[in-house]
Amino acid sequence: MPQRLEIGDERTNRLVPSVASADEISVDVTLTGEVPAWRAATGYMLFGADRSLEFAWLPSVPQGTVAIRYTVGGDEHETTGVGYHDHNWGNVGLMKVVHDWYWARGQAGPYSVIASYVTATKSYGSEPIPIFMLARDNVVIGDHPTKVTFEREGIYTDDATGKPVARETSYLYQDGDDRYAVSLTRRRDLTRSRMIDSVKGLKHIAARLARFDGAYLRFAGDIEVSHHHGGELVDTYADEALWELMYFGHAARDDIRGET
Protein backbone atom coordinates (compact mmCIF):
# COMPACT_ATOMS: atom_id res chain seq x y z
CA MET A 1 0.00 0.00 0.00
CA PRO A 2 1.71 3.25 -1.08
CA GLN A 3 1.98 5.79 1.69
CA ARG A 4 2.97 9.39 2.13
CA LEU A 5 3.90 11.30 5.25
CA GLU A 6 2.28 14.69 5.67
CA ILE A 7 4.01 16.96 8.16
CA GLY A 8 1.66 19.38 9.87
CA ASP A 9 2.94 21.75 12.53
CA GLU A 10 5.91 20.87 14.72
CA ARG A 11 3.74 18.71 16.99
CA THR A 12 1.77 16.73 14.40
CA ASN A 13 2.79 13.96 12.02
CA ARG A 14 0.16 12.43 9.79
CA LEU A 15 0.67 9.15 7.89
CA VAL A 16 -1.85 8.82 5.06
CA PRO A 17 -2.22 5.92 2.58
CA SER A 18 -2.47 7.50 -0.85
CA VAL A 19 -3.98 4.36 -2.42
CA ALA A 20 -6.52 2.17 -0.59
CA SER A 21 -6.32 -0.97 -2.68
CA ALA A 22 -4.99 -3.65 -0.35
CA ASP A 23 -7.92 -6.00 0.27
CA GLU A 24 -10.30 -3.03 0.52
CA ILE A 25 -8.43 -1.70 3.53
CA SER A 26 -7.49 1.94 4.10
CA VAL A 27 -5.89 3.53 7.14
CA ASP A 28 -5.52 7.15 8.24
CA VAL A 29 -3.28 7.69 11.27
CA THR A 30 -2.72 11.03 13.00
CA LEU A 31 0.06 11.19 15.60
CA THR A 32 -0.01 14.35 17.70
CA GLY A 33 2.94 15.08 19.94
CA GLU A 34 2.28 15.94 23.58
CA VAL A 35 5.85 15.99 24.88
CA PRO A 36 7.89 18.23 22.52
CA ALA A 37 10.61 16.76 20.31
CA TRP A 38 13.71 16.03 22.38
CA ARG A 39 17.26 14.76 22.03
CA ALA A 40 19.90 13.60 24.48
CA ALA A 41 22.50 16.41 24.50
CA THR A 42 23.44 16.82 20.81
CA GLY A 43 21.73 13.56 19.90
CA TYR A 44 25.05 12.08 18.73
CA MET A 45 27.15 9.29 20.25
CA LEU A 46 30.73 9.64 19.00
CA PHE A 47 33.29 6.84 18.98
CA GLY A 48 37.01 6.59 18.21
CA ALA A 49 40.02 8.71 19.09
CA ASP A 50 39.10 11.18 16.36
CA ARG A 51 35.37 10.91 17.19
CA SER A 52 34.66 10.15 13.54
CA LEU A 53 32.26 7.24 14.12
CA GLU A 54 28.79 8.40 14.99
CA PHE A 55 25.36 7.10 15.86
CA ALA A 56 22.54 9.61 16.30
CA TRP A 57 19.05 9.27 17.71
CA LEU A 58 16.16 11.72 17.90
CA PRO A 59 12.72 11.08 19.44
CA SER A 60 10.65 13.53 17.39
CA VAL A 61 7.52 12.51 19.31
CA PRO A 62 8.59 11.26 22.77
CA GLN A 63 4.96 10.86 23.82
CA GLY A 64 1.82 11.55 21.84
CA THR A 65 -1.76 10.63 21.09
CA VAL A 66 -2.90 8.63 18.08
CA ALA A 67 -6.21 8.92 16.26
CA ILE A 68 -6.87 6.16 13.73
CA ARG A 69 -9.58 5.95 11.11
CA TYR A 70 -9.63 2.72 9.13
CA THR A 71 -11.98 1.20 6.60
CA VAL A 72 -12.41 -2.51 5.96
CA GLY A 73 -14.73 -3.57 3.16
CA GLY A 74 -16.59 -0.27 3.27
CA ASP A 75 -17.08 -0.31 7.05
CA GLU A 76 -15.41 2.64 8.76
CA HIS A 77 -13.99 2.46 12.27
CA GLU A 78 -12.24 4.90 14.60
CA THR A 79 -10.02 4.35 17.61
CA THR A 80 -7.43 6.16 19.69
CA GLY A 81 -4.27 5.34 21.59
CA VAL A 82 -0.80 6.52 22.55
CA GLY A 83 2.13 6.90 20.18
CA TYR A 84 5.84 7.48 19.81
CA HIS A 85 8.12 8.26 16.89
CA ASP A 86 11.90 8.47 16.57
CA HIS A 87 14.69 8.51 14.01
CA ASN A 88 18.22 7.13 14.13
CA TRP A 89 21.12 7.34 11.72
CA GLY A 90 24.89 7.07 11.63
CA ASN A 91 28.01 6.17 9.66
CA VAL A 92 28.97 2.95 11.46
CA GLY A 93 27.25 -0.37 12.07
CA LEU A 94 25.90 -0.60 15.61
CA MET A 95 27.51 -3.98 16.19
CA LYS A 96 30.94 -2.35 15.84
CA VAL A 97 30.37 0.21 18.58
CA VAL A 98 27.57 -1.08 20.83
CA HIS A 99 27.82 -4.19 22.99
CA ASP A 100 24.30 -4.01 24.43
CA TRP A 101 21.56 -1.65 25.50
CA TYR A 102 18.43 -1.50 27.58
CA TRP A 103 15.81 0.85 26.16
CA ALA A 104 12.42 1.72 27.60
CA ARG A 105 9.65 4.24 27.33
CA GLY A 106 6.47 4.53 29.33
CA GLN A 107 3.91 6.70 31.01
CA ALA A 108 2.67 6.65 34.59
CA GLY A 109 0.28 9.29 35.83
CA PRO A 110 1.58 12.72 34.75
CA TYR A 111 5.05 11.34 34.00
CA SER A 112 6.44 10.35 30.58
CA VAL A 113 9.76 8.51 30.43
CA ILE A 114 12.39 7.56 27.89
CA ALA A 115 15.29 5.69 29.46
CA SER A 116 18.21 3.79 28.00
CA TYR A 117 21.55 2.44 29.14
CA VAL A 118 24.01 1.75 26.34
CA THR A 119 27.29 -0.11 26.83
CA ALA A 120 29.98 0.39 24.18
CA THR A 121 32.01 -2.50 22.81
CA LYS A 122 35.30 -3.46 24.42
CA SER A 123 37.13 -1.68 21.59
CA TYR A 124 35.72 1.56 22.98
CA GLY A 125 36.36 0.84 26.64
CA SER A 126 32.97 -0.72 27.40
CA GLU A 127 31.94 2.82 28.30
CA PRO A 128 28.41 3.31 29.66
CA ILE A 129 26.18 5.81 27.87
CA PRO A 130 23.08 6.68 29.93
CA ILE A 131 20.15 8.35 28.18
CA PHE A 132 17.24 9.68 30.18
CA MET A 133 14.25 11.95 29.67
CA LEU A 134 11.59 12.55 32.30
CA ALA A 135 8.62 14.81 31.61
CA ARG A 136 5.79 15.80 33.91
CA ASP A 137 2.59 17.20 32.42
CA ASN A 138 4.37 17.17 29.03
CA VAL A 139 7.23 19.40 30.23
CA VAL A 140 10.74 17.90 30.42
CA ILE A 141 11.99 18.14 34.01
CA GLY A 142 15.09 15.94 33.85
CA ASP A 143 17.45 14.87 31.08
CA HIS A 144 21.07 15.37 32.21
CA PRO A 145 23.02 12.09 31.78
CA THR A 146 25.47 12.80 34.61
CA LYS A 147 22.59 12.82 37.10
CA VAL A 148 21.46 9.29 36.20
CA THR A 149 22.39 6.07 37.98
CA PHE A 150 21.40 2.77 36.36
CA GLU A 151 20.78 -0.39 38.40
CA ARG A 152 19.98 -4.00 37.50
CA GLU A 153 18.56 -6.60 39.85
CA GLY A 154 17.60 -10.27 39.63
CA ILE A 155 19.92 -11.10 36.73
CA TYR A 156 19.40 -14.52 35.13
CA THR A 157 20.43 -16.18 31.87
CA ASP A 158 17.72 -16.34 29.23
CA ASP A 159 17.68 -19.94 28.02
CA ALA A 160 16.64 -19.05 24.46
CA THR A 161 19.41 -16.53 23.76
CA GLY A 162 22.03 -17.19 26.42
CA LYS A 163 22.01 -13.52 27.39
CA PRO A 164 21.98 -12.09 30.94
CA VAL A 165 18.65 -10.42 31.64
CA ALA A 166 17.63 -8.24 34.58
CA ARG A 167 14.22 -8.85 36.12
CA GLU A 168 14.22 -5.23 37.25
CA THR A 169 15.98 -2.18 35.86
CA SER A 170 16.00 1.18 37.61
CA TYR A 171 17.02 4.68 36.57
CA LEU A 172 17.69 7.00 39.51
CA TYR A 173 17.82 10.72 38.75
CA GLN A 174 19.23 13.04 41.42
CA ASP A 175 18.79 16.77 40.86
CA GLY A 176 19.60 18.74 43.99
CA ASP A 177 17.01 17.90 46.65
CA ASP A 178 14.81 16.15 44.09
CA ARG A 179 15.22 12.44 43.45
CA TYR A 180 13.22 10.57 40.82
CA ALA A 181 13.23 6.79 40.57
CA VAL A 182 11.98 4.97 37.49
CA SER A 183 11.71 1.19 37.95
CA LEU A 184 10.72 -1.41 35.36
CA THR A 185 9.77 -4.89 36.56
CA ARG A 186 9.52 -7.73 34.04
CA ARG A 187 6.32 -9.80 34.08
CA ARG A 188 6.56 -11.67 30.78
CA ASP A 189 8.60 -11.94 27.60
CA LEU A 190 7.23 -10.75 24.27
CA THR A 191 10.27 -11.56 22.12
CA ARG A 192 13.33 -13.75 22.67
CA SER A 193 15.19 -14.06 19.39
CA ARG A 194 18.69 -14.89 18.25
CA MET A 195 19.45 -12.64 15.30
CA ILE A 196 21.39 -15.35 13.48
CA ASP A 197 18.22 -17.45 13.20
CA SER A 198 16.70 -14.90 10.83
CA VAL A 199 19.70 -15.01 8.48
CA LYS A 200 19.69 -17.68 5.78
CA GLY A 201 22.09 -19.20 3.27
CA LEU A 202 25.63 -17.93 2.88
CA LYS A 203 24.99 -15.02 5.22
CA HIS A 204 24.05 -17.49 7.96
CA ILE A 205 27.28 -19.43 7.41
CA ALA A 206 29.32 -16.23 7.43
CA ALA A 207 27.65 -15.08 10.64
CA ARG A 208 28.48 -18.38 12.33
CA LEU A 209 32.09 -18.20 11.18
CA ALA A 210 32.30 -14.68 12.57
CA ARG A 211 30.83 -15.98 15.87
CA PHE A 212 28.00 -13.48 15.67
CA ASP A 213 25.87 -13.87 18.78
CA GLY A 214 23.38 -11.01 18.66
CA ALA A 215 20.00 -11.26 20.36
CA TYR A 216 16.90 -9.15 20.84
CA LEU A 217 14.54 -9.43 23.80
CA ARG A 218 11.38 -7.46 24.49
CA PHE A 219 9.51 -7.42 27.78
CA ALA A 220 6.13 -6.43 29.19
CA GLY A 221 5.77 -5.43 32.79
CA ASP A 222 5.26 -2.61 35.24
CA ILE A 223 6.73 0.88 35.38
CA GLU A 224 6.80 2.87 38.60
CA VAL A 225 7.85 6.51 38.86
CA SER A 226 8.41 8.04 42.28
CA HIS A 227 9.52 11.52 43.32
CA HIS A 228 11.23 12.36 46.60
CA HIS A 229 12.12 15.88 47.74
CA GLY A 230 14.49 16.30 50.65
CA GLY A 231 14.00 12.65 51.53
CA GLU A 232 10.21 12.93 51.69
CA LEU A 233 7.99 11.08 49.23
CA VAL A 234 6.09 13.52 47.01
CA ASP A 235 4.24 11.10 44.71
CA THR A 236 4.33 7.65 43.12
CA TYR A 237 2.58 6.44 39.97
CA ALA A 238 2.54 3.03 38.28
CA ASP A 239 1.34 1.61 34.98
CA GLU A 240 2.18 -1.00 32.35
CA ALA A 241 5.15 -0.61 30.02
CA LEU A 242 7.27 -2.26 27.32
CA TRP A 243 11.06 -2.26 27.06
CA GLU A 244 13.85 -4.07 25.27
CA LEU A 245 17.33 -5.50 25.57
CA MET A 246 19.45 -5.43 22.42
CA TYR A 247 22.54 -7.55 22.94
CA PHE A 248 25.03 -7.62 20.06
CA GLY A 249 28.08 -8.85 21.95
CA HIS A 250 29.01 -12.04 23.76
CA ALA A 251 27.84 -12.37 27.34
CA ALA A 252 30.58 -11.89 29.91
CA ARG A 253 31.19 -14.99 31.99
CA ASP A 254 30.43 -13.15 35.24
CA ASP A 255 27.03 -12.09 33.90
CA ILE A 256 25.81 -15.61 33.18
CA ARG A 257 23.79 -17.28 35.91
CA GLY A 258 20.72 -19.43 36.24
CA GLU A 259 17.09 -18.47 36.66
CA THR A 260 16.27 -17.53 40.24
Predicted segments, located by residue:
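Structured soluble/peripheral alpha/beta segments that form catalytic or ligand/cofactor-binding pockets
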Residues: 1-260
